[in-house]
C-alpha cells in the first residue's frame, strides 16, 4: 500500500528548515527529479462536528464543466499485445524496473504525466489491467470527484479479493457512495470515532509507554532494538483500548493480533505485492493465481470472535440502523485491522524514518516546541489545545504523509466521457475507462512543491499551509472533510491525531534517536540504535 521504494530520496538538510510554498515554475515533467542515495541516519471528526482546521484554506470543488483552455492531446502509451503486454508490464513493475522506475521511465518516454499502461496483477487474476496513469497534482484529484468516477470494487485496483476473506460481504471500502449500505456503514464508523474521542489521548500514551519499555529493554540488552514488531503490537492495543475499552492481552486473542492480521492482509494484497521471494515463485504463487482463502480462515475467525465480543455496543447500534450484527462486525474488523492498523503499520515506521534521517537539529526543535507547549498550554499534560500550539510537529506529520503516503495506489472508473486536465494538456477520457493515480508522484509534483523529493520539516508552517490541499493521503485533499457522499477515509482526522501523538510522545520522552532503515513488503523496516532520554 504505502510506497516502500522511497529509501533513496534526498534527505532533509537540517540546516535549512524554511517554509516552502510554491516557487518558480519548473520544467514540464519529472525528468529533473534528483535521486541521491541517503543512507545516513538522518463529515465527522475526532474533534467534534468539525474537521481539523487548516488556517487560511478554503477548499474549492473541482470545476464541473468540460471546457478547457489547454490543448487537447491524445493520451499517449499503449497496452501491448493481449496477454503479453500485461505480463511484460507486471514484470517491469515488480522486477525489471521496480515501481518508481516503472512510472518514471514511461513519464519520460511519453513526456507526459498522463499515459496508458497495464497495472498488476493482470493475467490470470484481473480480467482487465488497462488503466490511464495519473502522476501530477492537477490530474490526480479527479479520482476524488464522485461526479466523474465510481469506486465500486476498486479499493485494491483492477482486481477485488474474494469476499470469502471478509465473511462473504463486500466491505465498505469496496462500496461506491451511490450504494445504500455505504451511508449506513460509513456513518457507523463516524459514530464510533466520535463517541470514543475522549479515550484517544490517554490510551495512546499508555500504549506508547508499553512500546518504549520494549525498545529500551532491547537496546540495553542487545545494543539495538527492532521497532516494527513492538510498534505493531502497540498500535493494535491502542486501537482496541481506544475504540472498545478492551485490552487484547486479557482476551483469548492475547498478543496474536499483529501476526494474524499480517497473514490475512497478505491474502488480500498478494497479487500486488512483492514479498522478497524469487521472481519465478512470486509469479507462480502470488501474481498469477489467488491464494486460497481457506488457508487463513481460522486466523480470521479468531479476529472475528474478538470483535464480536469487544465491539458489542457498536454492533447494537448497527442493528438499530438496519445493519446485521454479522455484516457490521466484518466491517468493524476490516476498518480496525486493515484500514487503521494496516495504515499505522506503514505510517509509524515512516515517521521514524524521516524524522530520524533529519537529524539532531530537527529533534531538538521538536523537543523544545513539544515540551514548551505541554507546560504552557497543557498544564503539564498532552492535550488537544497544547498540540495546536506545535506548528513544527504538525508540519512534520503532514510532510511525512506527503512524501510517503500510506496508500500509494488509487483508482476510479469513469462514469461518463469527460475532459481530464494535467498541467500541460487536456485529454479525452471515455466512460468505463479505469483511472489510476500513483500518489507519491502527485504529492511530489515539482510544479507545486519546492524541493519536492526532500523531507522539509517545516514545509507546512506559516504560508506553507496553503499547500495542504495537495496532501491527499486520505483519498481526498487534507482541506476537505470525509462524508457519506465521498470515499475519503472515515478516520482521516483520527489518523492525523494518532500521528501527532506519536511525535509528541516520542519527543516528550527523548531528546534524539538514531536508526537504521531497511525495507519490507509494506513500508520501512526500522532498527533503533540509540535513544537519548530527555535532559530538559
Curated annotation (Swiss-Prot):
Keywords, sorted A to Z: Chloroplast, Fatty acid biosynthesis, Fatty acid metabolism, Heme, Iron, Lipid biosynthesis, Lipid metabolism, Lyase, Metal-binding, Oxylipin biosynthesis, Plastid, Transit peptide
Xref: Pfam families: p450 (PF00067)
The EC number(s) this enzyme carries: 4.2.1.92
Gene Ontology cellular component list: chloroplast envelope; chloroplast thylakoid membrane
Domain of life: Eukaryota
Annotated (13S)-hydroperoxy-(9Z,11E,15Z)-octadecatrienoate binding sites: 339
PANTHER family: ALLENE OXIDE SYNTHASE, CHLOROPLASTIC, CYTOCHROME P450 26
The family this protein is said to belong to: Belongs to the cytochrome P450 family.
Protein name, UniProt field: Allene oxide synthase, chloroplastic
Organism: Linum usitatissimum (Flax)
